[in-house]
């Protein structure tokens, strides 16, 4: 099957009809307005414009708002600005909108943070001190992340995307899992996605445990149950790209890893597929032929419930993935299926069946633009083109609440404001 996909003659390939999945995002609007020498294309635009471009021009099923520095720690001094941006976006958008950032525990070490760099301490054979530094940093990571998301959730965010969990090793994952646990306890209805930084959790500390399981050395199929236990709705497994090997070799390895993770996970899996992970080549402008083949393989062979679109230019990442395997958001029913995955932890098959039943259509109709255009206009649940008088933003989402039998956070905020 994989060989067939790789050898298909077309430049772009796509999943078979009916197998489309919802997409989530890393890096927010930075791929549009960012210009840091990586994958941002430097278009001067507001984040509202960036988010709505993903929703209405790219056909995204979900989107996220993110700070230009894209870590939780730098958000603290400007959290009021982030909250205002979130409110404005939620008033104008229909698809689920997350707040995304990296836990990035490395920012808590000197010279950027208050704690001694454990790498320097270990070089000096101060092992106990290095352990303590990591433990303190993890505590601060948990505290800061929870505080930031308390503010953002109060401003209408649908949820949070933890991007590159474990980037600084097992301490980073430890702090993030405890943040997820605290947020789930405080906000039962928050959408929580936890995407990993790498395929194996690095044992920088080595002794840290969560739920009695040592975090160091965990692989995707072992990470998934812990992320679910902490309270996440969706897990983002990773398989690293080996830049010394071919795309075919990397994709075969990635599909093998992710298929095992999907099988072991009690919650939906949105495989991370930015440049350098998930069988995607390491290039700022990811090759479209490689991206679409990887996207198709992950859906049809690994059986993922969704794809987390990561770093890469707009053409090579969101557009290519959505063309290959996405549900095209408000053009069809992608946003509705995504909401069921996040609000009820439904796997892709169950989510599609639920939404199709509520709409009174076949599952195949969920990606039929003609069928869904008429239905969305009739039900007033938001349409992708701007029709005067049609429900938009909060109004459309209130109708989606009634249709799907769920509560949407931005609608709850609006109801409180007019009470």
UniProtKB/Swiss-Prot annotation:
It catalyses: Co(I)-[dimethylamine-specific corrinoid protein] + dimethylamine + H(+) = methyl-Co(III)-[dimethylamine-specific corrinoid protein] + methylamine. Its EC number is 2.1.1.249. InterPro entries: Dimeth_MeTrfase_MtbB. GO terms for biological process: methane biosynthetic process from dimethylamine; methylation. Keywords: Methanogenesis, Methyltransferase, Pyrrolysine, Transferase. GO terms for molecular function: dimethylamine methyltransferase activity. Pathway: One-carbon metabolism; methanogenesis from dimethylamine. It holds the Pfam family Dimeth_Pyl. Catalyzes the transfer of a methyl group from dimethylamine to the corrinoid cofactor of MtbC. No evidence for expression of this protein has been found after growth under presumably inducing conditions. Belongs to the dimethylamine methyltransferase family. This is Dimethylamine methyltransferase MtbB2. It comes from Methanosarcina barkeri. The gene is mtbB2.
């Amino acid at each position: 099957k994989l060989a067939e996909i790789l050898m298909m003659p077309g430049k772009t390939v796509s999943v078979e009809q009916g197998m489309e999945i919802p997409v989530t995002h890393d890096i927010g609007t930075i791929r549009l307005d960012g210009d840091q020498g990586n994958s941002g294309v430097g278009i001067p635009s507001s984040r509202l414009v960036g988010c709505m471009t993903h929703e209405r021009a790219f056909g995204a099923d979900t989107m996220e708002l993110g700070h230009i520095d894209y870590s939780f720690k730098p958000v603290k001094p400007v959290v009021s600005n982030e909250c205002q941006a979130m409110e404005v976006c939620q008033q104008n958008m229909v698809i689920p909108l997350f707040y995304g950032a990296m836990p990035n525990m490395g920012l808590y070490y000197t010279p950027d943070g208050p704690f001694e760099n454990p790498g320097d301490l270990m070089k000096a054979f101060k092992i106990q001190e290095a352990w303590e530094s990591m433990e303190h940093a993890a505590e601060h990571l948990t505290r800061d992340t929870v505080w930031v998301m308390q503010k953002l959730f109060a401003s209408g965010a649908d949820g949070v995307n933890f991007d590159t969990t474990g980037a600084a090793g097992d301490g980073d994952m430890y702090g993030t899992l405890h943040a997820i646990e605290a947020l789930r306890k405080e906000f039962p209805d928050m959408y929580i996605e936890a995407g990993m930084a790498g395929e194996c959790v690095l044992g920088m500390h080595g002794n840290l445990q969560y739920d009695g399981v040592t975090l160091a050395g965990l692989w995707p199929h072992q990470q998934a149950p812990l992320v679910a236990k902490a309270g996440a709705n969706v897990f983002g497994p990773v398989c690293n790209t080996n830049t010394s090997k071919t795309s075919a070799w990397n994709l075969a390895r990635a599909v093998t890893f992710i298929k095992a993770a999907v099988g072991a996970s009690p919650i939906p899996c949105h495989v991370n597929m930015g440049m350098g992970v998930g069988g995607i080549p390491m290039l700022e402008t990811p090759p479209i032929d490689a991206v679409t083949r990887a996207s198709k393989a992950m859906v049809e062979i690994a059986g993922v419930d969704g794809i987390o679109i990561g770093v890469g230019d707009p053409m090579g990442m969101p557009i290519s993935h959505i063309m290959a395997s996405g549900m095209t958001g408000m053009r069809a029913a992608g946003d509705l299926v995504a909401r069921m995955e996040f609000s009820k932890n439904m796997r892709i098959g169950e989510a599609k069946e639920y939404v199709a039943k509520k709409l009174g259509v076949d599952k195949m109709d969920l990606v039929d633009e003609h069928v869904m255009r008429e239905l969305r206009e009739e039900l007033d649940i938001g349409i992708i083109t701007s029709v005067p008088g049609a429900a938009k933003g909060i109004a459309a989402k209130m109708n989606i609440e009634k249709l799907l039998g769920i509560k949407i956070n931005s609608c709850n905020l609006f109801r409180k404001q007019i009470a």
